[in-house]
Amino acid sequence: MYPAYPYRGYRRECEQVGLTFPPQHQERQPGLEYLMDPPPLAENPAVRGSGRLAGKAALITGGDSGIGRAVALAFAREGADVAISYLNEHKDAAETRRRVEAQGRGSLVLPADLRMESECARTVGRVMDRFERLDILVCNHAVQYVQPSILDIGADQLSDTFQTNILSYFYLIQAALPGMERGSAIITTTSITAYQ
């Protein structure tokens, strides 16, 4: 099996070098990173921080695993205090927290269903209460239900996807923006699924 294909010819290149590993697809949303074998790499130990984010506070949604965990660890390495939100992946979130704190940074781990506007406001409020600032908001959480055809997408799936991947980003930004100072950053992410 191969990972999702980031570009044409990727699978052929993997086969040429004998690169294979077990399937990483999980039926549940969100997935559980601790079940993946081999586990994804979230940081490069050869990279040293330079303190570029010292004194800053960041909120990374979906920060328990994947891209979110990698961002959380990179920001901590650069000196930021890091808050992560996640839905229900408690074990993954605890591991991210452990790794952020191992870098000597403050951390906050917040379970939240960000499909609800009130949860977005509560999450941002908790970050402001803990760190007394929010300099970087990374909207990274998402669901991805890959379907072969638009005809296979039901109303519930469509609604859940829009609530999670679009409306919640709006709610988070709306909650965070009044407390963010000039020069702060709002970042949104996507994954390879957008290109399949």
Regions found by a protein language model. Name each.
Residues 142-143, 185-196:
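Catalytic loop of short-chain dehydrogenase/reductase
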Residues 73-74, 125, 129, 164-184, ...:
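Amphipathic alpha-helical dimer-interface segment in Rossmann-like NAD(P)H-dependent oxidoreductases
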Residues 151-170, 187:
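Catalytic Tyr-X3-Lys loop
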Residues 61, 134-142, 165, 188:
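Rossmann-fold scaffold of SDR-type NAD(P)-dependent oxidoreductases
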Residues 51-83:
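Canonical Rossmann dinucleotide-binding motif of NAD(H)/NADP(H)-dependent dehydrogenases/reductases
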Residues 1-54, 183:
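Non-catalytic terminal and boundary segments that flank Rossmann-like NAD(P)-dependent oxidoreductase
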Residues 80-95:
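Conserved glycine-rich Rossmann-like NAD(P)H-binding loop of the short-chain dehydrogenase/reductase
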Residues 6, 20-21, 116, 121, ...:
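Conserved mid-core segment of classical short-chain dehydrogenase/reductases
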